[in-house]
Amino acid sequence: MEAVLTEELDEEEQLLRRHRKEKKELQAKIQGMKNAVPKNDKKRRKQLTEDVAKLEKEMEQKHREELEQLKLTTKENKIDSVAVNISNLVLENQPPRISKAQKRREKKAALEKEREERIAEAEIENLTGARHMESEKLAQILAARQLEIKQIPSDGHCMYKAIEDQLKEKDCALTVVALRSQTAEYMQSHVEDFLPFLTNPNTGDMYTPEEFQKYCEDIVNTAAWGGQLELRALSHILQTPIEIIQADSPPIIVGEEYSKKPLILVYMRHAYGLGEHYNSVTRLVNIVTENCS
């Protein structure tokens, strides 16, 4: 009986993992579809919204049917196994027992599904909402400088990846890992320049030395999001100014004391419906084409 239950949990976990993978792949596909449709093409944008909703509905139905089929098959296998070993046991009117582990997995899967649905809803809403307006403003600001946004993945490393991308244009090959490590080292060796600006979110008090040390360790060892302090450290490390372009505020330049050509990042408050995000920039495609013709 224990072997049957273990196999049941293994099969369900594998199915739920595949479902999560398929959902992530669908979100990536949807993002690609959105990027392929011009922002000012309202007719195609409307059709895109309908297509996205259809794709998500079809996947949700497919996953529900697969999960129901697995549970049905598992139930039948369990009954067959018990019948072989305990021939005199009457199974009628005895509902299948659900283990605590299975309940936890189902609850976790339900929460994950709810989260992904909220993200998908935010994505669709932002086609005409704050994200769309922010993107339009940034596109105009950058176009005036013959630039456009270069998308960077939203994975916690976006600021460092945007810096990495900008450095490639200068033939400087520093990876995200190296940038994070050097940032933490610089901040640890210049504590007085950074500690006063960090406060405990629960108490409002300035970080203790131990909390500051943990903050620096997280820069190296986790996907901790980088902000103004990390940009300040990077400008000193690279001895290069860093310009941050925003939709509703003037550009911010960190490291103005340096004379090199600045690295340019785009700061977005409403990216992906998930909060703040950094992107890189590149030259406008049509400008590059004209120069090469």
From Swiss-Prot:
Residue ranges of the region described as Variable-loop: 219-229
Entry protein name: Deubiquitinase OTUD6B
Domain OTU, residue spans: 147-284
Catalytic site: 155, 158, 277
Keyword Protein transport in record: no
Region (Cys-loop): 152-158
GO molecular function, one term: cysteine-type deubiquitinase activity
Pfam families in UniProt: OTU
EC number annotated for this UniProt entry: 3.4.19.12
CDD domains: OTU_OTUD6 (cd22761)
Top-level lineage group: Eukaryota
Keyword ATP-binding listed: no
A Gene Ontology BP annotation from the UniProt entry: protein deubiquitination
Keywords: Acetylation, Disease variant, Epilepsy, Hydrolase, Intellectual disability, Protease, Thiol protease, Ubl conjugation pathway
Reactions listed under catalytic activity: Thiol-dependent hydrolysis of ester, thioester, amide, peptide and isopeptide bonds formed by the C-terminal Gly of ubiquitin (a 76-residue protein attached to proteins as an intracellular targeting signal)
Disease entry from the Swiss-Prot or TrEMBL record: Intellectual developmental disorder with dysmorphic facies, seizures, and distal limb anomalies: An autosomal recessive severe multisystem disorder characterized by poor overall growth, developmental delay, early-onset seizures, intellectual disability, and dysmorphic features. Additional features include microcephaly, absent speech, hypotonia, feeding difficulties, structural brain abnormalities, congenital malformations including congenital heart disease, and musculoskeletal features.
Subunit structure: Interacts with the eukaryotic translation initiation factor 4F complex.
